[in-house]
Amino acid sequence: MESEIASEFLPFCRIYKDGRVERLIGTDTIPASLDPTYDVVSKDVIYSPENNLSVRLFLPHKSTKLTAGNKLPLLIYIHGGAWIIESPFSPLYHNYLTEVVKSANCLAVSVQYRRAPEDPVPAAYEDVWSAIQWIFAHSNGSGPVDWINKHADFGKVFLGGDSAGGNISHHMAMKAGKEKKLDLKIKGIAVVHPAFWGTDPVDEYDVQDKETRSGIAEIWEKIASPNSVNGTDDPLFNVNGSGSDFSGLGCDKVLVAVAGKDVFVRQGLAYAAKLEKCEWEGTVEVVEEEGEDHVFHLQNPKSDKALKFLKKFVEFIIG
């Protein structure tokens, strides 16, 4: 007999009374491949045996035939999915990172992290931080992964992520800036359609609709981060809150991308404005695509606007 449903958090998942979690979207996977058909090869490597977590690496095929002196920009990518769905192995992210690596001629490391509800926030942040340290352990050329040892330019390290991954990217750069003794030098972060929120709208143009605001709050408070003391004003979610300070952000430049129809658009713009006003000495670039919705560049990657953003993202990495 099928288990009884305890709760549903549409469109993401369904939780049964026996504790089983059924993800309703974002579950498809595609294998890594050393086939150079698309000019990019990929492979999976475990970085956290204790949690059975891997990274998926993407490398331009031509680089596999070159010497160790062929150093490439390194993109550490953090997928989105409301802290609940998706992975580096989904077609959505595999195909996107393939295009980014092909266009930017960079090495990309796409990070798997534990997801809610089985492992609620802050597990995802802890895992990504662990992965970043694992990646930087290759900076002296003696790490466990040859691709990183041979091809990563640790003077050109970028973090990038969309939605929840954009949120995590910001917090990782903040942590890198704070943990100076670790010497994790990050050149820039790309914060794409970041999932930032709060109890109150950031301005008069932010989402005012109570049903929408309560729906996002429910996802955060009941499934993504049920242990948050302050609900949607948790500093991990409400980065634009009055108590936040970006002056210690550990990177030189930030690309903030927002979409006009996205519920997070005003939060993203407020984030960029706060960066520009604080004592952080880096540079901020804002890319706003009117008439588009959340992660449109992933959902419709061949559209003119998606290709336009891909070009901007690539310029950010190689510029």
Curated annotation (Swiss-Prot):
One of its GO terms (cellular component) is cytosol. InterPro entries: AB_hydrolase_3 (IPR013094), AB_hydrolase_fold (IPR029058), Carboxylest/Gibb_receptor (IPR050466). The active site is at residues 163, 262, 294. The modification N-acetylmethionine is found at residue 1. The keyword Nucleus does not apply. Expressed in roots, leaves, stems, flowers and siliques. Keywords: Acetylation, Hydrolase, Serine esterase. GO terms for molecular function: carboxylesterase activity; carboxylic ester hydrolase activity. Gene3D superfamilies: alpha/beta hydrolase. It holds the Pfam family Abhydrolase_3. Its EC number is 3.1.1.1. It catalyses: a carboxylic ester + H2O = an alcohol + a carboxylate + H(+). It comes from the Eukaryota. A motif (Involved in the stabilization of the negatively charged intermediate by the formation of the oxyanion hole) lies at residues 79-81. Carboxylesterase acting on esters with varying acyl chain length. Belongs to the 'GDXG' lipolytic enzyme family. This is Probable carboxylesterase 5. It comes from Arabidopsis thaliana.
